[in-house]
Amino acid sequence: FLRGNVKMEVGFTVAPNGTGFVANSTFMPGVTAEMVDWWFGWHSVGPDLRYKIWDPEDHYYARAMDPAYVLDPKVPNNQKTWGVTHDISEDIGLGVDPLKLSFKKPSDLGYDMSLIGTPGCATMVCAVGVSGSPAVMTHKVVNAEGGIWFKSHFWVGYGLDESGRIN
């Protein structure tokens, strides 16, 4: 995933065990990887409107449970989500669902950190969602002429067990 394209850029599938995989790739003109890094911290520590900007019809709020860490100027923008849980309200198609997103350092999910900041992956945001429908989320940003490709992968049905491992 970090080294280049994957077989499924857009679409979904259901595995034999009932879990799902969703992939999406969106070109965002005029956007940079640095903007994405900044936004992921910024949207969780201010008015609810900040999260609604992403999707005004389906996003209601996202609130960092440790705003002091997110606001700390010593923490680089690309690390402001690492280890922070967000309390979120949004609708992913089945009605409003409160969830908690536990953001992770990409290496916590097995990604090679040496590949982040390269042409194949300018930056990355990872989280594990806890809700009625748990999921693992990865957003990879690839620089492109005139903007970025924002590539999202969701592994639906996977969450954290008591030890903090993904199951």
Predicted regions and their residues:
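Beta-strand/loop substructures that line and gate deep hydrophobic ligand-binding cavities in soluble
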Residues: 119-166
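Short loop/turn segments at secondary-structure transitions that flank enzyme active sites
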Residues: 42, 60, 109, 156-158
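Hydrophobic ligand-binding cavity/cleft-lining segments
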Residues: 1-75
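A residue-identity detector for tryptophan
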Residues: 38-42, 54, 82, 149, ...
